UniProtKB/Swiss-Prot annotation:
Sequence ranges on the Cytoplasmic membrane side: 1-29
GO cellular component, one term: plasma membrane
Entry-linked InterPro entries: PDZ_sf (IPR036034), T2SS_GspC_N (IPR024961), T2SS_protein-GspC (IPR001639)
Protein name (Swiss-Prot/TrEMBL): Type II secretion system protein C
Membrane spanning stretches: 30-50
Family classification: Belongs to the GSP C family.
GO biological process: protein secretion by the type II secretion system
Length: 305
């Protein structure tokens, strides 16, 4: 193999000039052909785009077969009746069984003092003023006596029955000794009629006898004029008055069954703690001024012992 010697470096410019003139024509023809092809391709693409925009393309829509135009509401009654999670049953309160009151209960050993009682024909409206360690308070049926675990169970004219740890016990009225059980209230005697002989004298004699009994023990007034506390929304409205074991005094002073007592000797009976003050001053009373509401009007009733 023979190797030709390359021309010297100084001869390169001359050689390049000769070769350029020789290749100029083929290069120009190739570039011209390439430009023509590119122009034709661009023109064809523009024509295709314009024709495609003018031709409308139909919009596709699904074919509905066997379907109703109106939507039917979903029936969930079957699910509701299925009781998937069970049947809700509202819990029923267990009936309250009231235990009978033991009227001959033994005397209590608790250091309590019964200062006064307001016995009512409706046992739930009876009240008792009980002092424990020098502190007096008024209690209703089933209320727990402050400072103890005992609760008031029944109120009688001369005593109360308390339930202490499930055991009935008797608390006597202050100043009275424990005796035989208190008897039930005597039924109301027949009212005297004006056409009966000696009816008026008997009525007046009975009233005088009751006044004398009250003068000896002013708390006896509550055996002939019963007071029942009336509340609304935990607020004391007063005390409903009703005749006691003998209605002669009740009628003689002008009271009517259902009157609402709102004041007694100037004491506001709507005060929840007024009974404490009332029973403390009972033994010093010689007369009683009772303010009652009747048919929306107030009336003052005076009782002299």
């Amino acid at each position: 193999m023979e190797f030709k010697q390359l021309p010297p470096l100084a001869a390169w410019p001359r050689l390049l000039s000769q070769n350029t003139l020789r290749w100029q024509k083929p290069i120009s023809e190739g570039l011209t052909l390439l430009l023509l092809v590119a122009s034709a391709w661009t023109l064809g693409k523009m024509v295709w785009v314009v024709s495609a925009e003018q031709t409308p393309v139909p919009t596709w829509s699904p074919t509905l077969s066997g379907l109703k135009a109106e939507r039917q509401p979903l029936d969930i009654s079957v699910l509701q009746k299925g009781e998937l999670f069970g049947v809700f049953t509202e819990p029923k309160e267990a009936p309250v069984v009231e235990q009978p009151v033991v009227v001959d209960a033994p005397k209590t050993r608790l250091s309590l003092v019964l200062s006064g009682v307001v016995a009512s024909n409706d046992a739930q409206k009876s009240l008792a003023v009980i002092a424990n360690r020098g502190v007096q308070a008024t209690y209703g049926i089933n209320e727990v006596i402050e400072g103890t675990q005992a609760k008031l169970k029944a109120v009688m004219p001369d005593r109360v029955i308390i339930s202490n740890s499930g055991r009935d016990e008797t608390l006597m009225l202050e100043g009275l000794d424990y005796t035989a059980p208190a008897t039930a209230s005597v039924s109301n005697p027949p009212r005297p009629r004006p056409n009966q002989p000696n009816a008026v004298p008997q009525f007046e004699d009975k009233v005088d006898a009751i006044r004398e009994a009250i003068a000896r023990n002013p708390q006896e007034i509550f055996q002939y004029v019963r007071l029942s506390q009336v509340k609304r929304d935990d607020k004391v409205l007063g005390y409903r008055v009703s005749p006691g074991k003998d209605p002669v005094l009740f009628e003689s002073i002008g009271l009517q069954d259902g009157d609402m007592a709102v004041a007694l000797n100037g004491l506001d009976l709507t005060d929840p703690n007024v009974m404490n003050t009332l029973f403390q001053s009972m033994n010093e009373m010689t007369e009683m001024s009772l303010t009652v509401e009747r048919d929306g009007q107030q009336h003052d009733v005076y009782i002299q012992f």
